[in-house]
Amino acid sequence: MWKQQIISTKRGTFELFTKGNGEPLCMTHHYSQFNETGDYFADVFTSTHRVFLINLRDAGNSVKAKVENELSMIETIHDLEAIKEALQFSTWHFAGHSTGGVLGLLYAITYPESLQSLVVVGAAASNYTETPFCIYHPAHPQFHYMQELIENLKSPHLTSEERKELSTKRTKVSLYIPEHYESYFYKPIHKSMSANRMNAFNTEYPYFNLRDSLSSIQTKTLITCGRHDIQCPIQYSIEMHEGIRNSIFVPFEDSNHYPFLEEAAHFTSTIQEFYKSLRQENTCL
């Protein structure tokens, strides 16, 4: 189980969960709500770092937003920096999957001195819904099915069984081999979604574009993506790699949106090799 912490910052009180040993690593997602059961993506990093899994404003037991603008991506980054300061870290690492990766990019751009490294998995620096290869594009054959699942998941009246069934269906759409779902998602981990944060994200994201700022990122960056990702298609990871100087890009040929589960051994070794190279560089300095 992950250990809960309530942190008071200059921007309010935030709930986070910690696990692992090593240098501090920040991890979050734009609209997920975490708890003591943790997170599959976060688990990968607990062998190399002390992971801080953060419930953002309006998620879990963190401070509530007074106005929707407080849920914007840039305000979220200011919240993360305030949490770092409250924890008395001068720097920390960051790893993010999907919208978590999007936040990681913006963090590295906004506070270039705060991150020792950045891992971005299945994310994008611009509106990934603009391509019909993305399931969130109206031309995608599974667009309406996915929208129906998302809207149903927003309901506060779902039973735990109903929520689990809807979440399973939503996740299976984003697996290269859906039949392997049970072998990937076997841990007693349960998360929920902050409807307010999801709605704020959907309002902001169509106008979101960090392409021109990627070249300013100096943080050591690893970018990975499943070759068959239908949420954040691989072309967006390639775009990030081309925009961020000296970044490393590793595609996962037999994965969709969850390479850390679909090709777990390969993903773990890729992550560990990345951090090993960072330590070697720091030793040589």
Give the ranges of each region predicted by the language model.
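Flexible "cap/lid" loop of the alpha/beta hydrolase fold
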Residues: 116-152
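Short beta-strand/loop motif that positions the catalytic acidic residue
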Residues: 217, 223-225
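Acidic catalytic loop of the alpha/beta-hydrolase fold
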Residues: 228-232
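Conserved alpha/beta-hydrolase catalytic His-Asp/Glu region
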Residues: 154-204
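Catalytic active-site module of serine/aspartate enzymes centered on a nucleophile-bearing elbow/loop
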Residues: 247-285
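Active-site loop/oxyanion-hole signature of alpha/beta-hydrolase fold enzymes
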Residues: 52-99, 269
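Conserved HGGG/HGGXW glycine-rich cap/lid loop of the alpha/beta-hydrolase fold
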Residues: 8-69
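Short glycine-enriched nucleophile-adjacent loop
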Residues: 101-112, 118
